[in-house]
């Protein structure tokens, strides 16, 4: 089981400046030394590198595009197998209603329970309906990761309307709720913690210096 507290997402895609398993492992080490209780990471290679640096549980994903599907976070059993081999403690996967490239969501949950009974499962959702469905399928954690990132939630953001979406998810599911997506300040982190989430994943605001720089530059432009 994940400990309660701050989970830091350490990810960089191939087109990003920090793309490197070595760099991700050092970001994870910095997060650990700063007090993070867990790491979220992408790819078997990154997870294995991170596990040589920190004694923290890892939420593992594999991002891979499939033609004809918008699902790209741990989309099929192929990615699940890679994550099982990585030794991550939690496997996260897209649990939205979007068209899947291969197995159904229920089939993937069954597959993980059969082949890795000691590994927990996290649902990345974008709507309350998806959260409720994931809860019914027996996910251990429900995360708000994809709010605003599906075609039917585009334009929405986790902190709008005083975190109304997060509050509704907390009210509707029995699984442990993880706040993730656009938690970009310590104040927001404190707010979602006070709402009763089990833990919170923060990524770009900590581990993506390009994104952080852009935020500062934009703030200066807005003032001019």
From Swiss-Prot:
Keyword Glycoprotein on entry: no
Pathway: Amino-sugar metabolism; N-acetylneuraminate degradation; D-fructose 6-phosphate from N-acetylneuraminate: step 3/5
Coiled-coil ranges from the UniProt annotation: none
Gene Ontology MF terms in the entry: N-acylglucosamine-6-phosphate 2-epimerase activity
Entries under InterPro entries matching the protein: Aldolase_TIM, NanE, RibuloseP-bd_barrel
Keywords: Carbohydrate metabolism, Isomerase
GO aspect biological process, one term: carbohydrate metabolic process
Function of the protein: Converts N-acetylmannosamine-6-phosphate (ManNAc-6-P) to N-acetylglucosamine-6-phosphate (GlcNAc-6-P).
Designated name of the protein: Putative N-acetylmannosamine-6-phosphate 2-epimerase
Organism: Staphylococcus carnosus (strain TM300)
Gene: nanE
């Amino acid at each position: 089981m994940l400990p309660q507290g701050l989970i830091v997402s350490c990810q960089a895609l191939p087109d990003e400046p920090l793309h490197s398993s070595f760099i991700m492992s050092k970001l994870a080490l910095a997060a650990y030394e700063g007090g993070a209780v867990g790491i979220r990471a992408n790819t078997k290679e990154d997870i294995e590198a991170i596990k040589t640096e920190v004694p923290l549980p890892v939420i593992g994903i594999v991002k891979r595009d499939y033609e004809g599907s918008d699902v790209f976070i741990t989309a099929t059993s192929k990615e699940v197998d890679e994550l099982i081999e990585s030794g991550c403690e939690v496997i996260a996967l897209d649990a939205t209603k979007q068209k899947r490239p291969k197995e159904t969501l229920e089939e993937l949950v069954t597959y993980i329970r059969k082949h890795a009974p000691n590994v927990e499962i996290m649902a990345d959702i974008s709507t309350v309906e998806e959260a409720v469905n994931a809860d019914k399928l027996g996910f251990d954690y429900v995360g708000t990761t994809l709010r605003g990132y599906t075609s039917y939630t585009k334009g929405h953001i986790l902190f709008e309307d005083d975190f109304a979406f997060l509050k509704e998810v907390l009210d509707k599911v029995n699984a442990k709720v993880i706040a993730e997506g656009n938690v970009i300040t310590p104040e927001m982190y404190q707010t979602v913690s006070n709402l009763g989430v089990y833990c919170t994943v923060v990524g770009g605001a900590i581990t993506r210096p390009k994104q952080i720089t852009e935020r500062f530059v934009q703030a200066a432009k807005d003032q001019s």
